[in-house]
């Protein structure tokens, strides 16, 4: 708060905006509304980036300006760098159709739904009103589903771009809370009502299915007592597993139907890392 106003005078083409703390979503939305560049990147306050990767991309011909550009990220902890373990495969993104790109992303065990590991064409964000929903946790998931449904062209930049600082406690699986569970449940219910394009529907439902299993997993946390309404709503969302393109998700559907969300959540916790 105290150093940023001084920093702005040292960095050219920088716009400094101050607003009272209204949460991450509103901070991003304010940035979007006040932006005027070709692309928008989202950087969390405790992380940092390799600016040269962006400069190399922006120096390219304007005729090749995709809607979304995927970027590599690494974990950073006290000067040490480690990899996430799942890197983008350029051949599954570059010069590929939207269907093939989403198909390639489905190979990830986790849904690549973070806002910070990609840059997005500003024109697309404004046209499709891709603002972040305020008042919820896991807003990146909700936003990414709308982004993937709206975008048509994709690309990939090689090189280490984003340094994700370790030791953070803001992940939904790292800090479980009642609001976190209700937020994820709300996001899943909202997307369950969306009409996705038929040719990409199964891939988007695979992303949702992963988050659905995360929901069942965190609902079994010892410090959280989920009421019957939350369990009922979670149970009714199991149909998403059948709409995904992954066999393992489809096989979990009858387990939930037979044993319910409580026992299934405990099973998922026992085999964590293998789904």
Residue ranges and their predicted role:
Residues 199-207:
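All-alpha amphipathic helical-bundle segments outside canonical DNA-binding/catalytic cores
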Residues 40:
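Short aromatic/hydrophobic "clamp" motif used to bind/position activated sugar donors
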Residues 19-35:
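Glycine-rich, basic loop-to-helix element that forms the pyrophosphate-binding segment
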Residues 221-275:
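Membrane-interface aromatic/basic loop that binds lipid-linked glycans or pyrophosphate carriers
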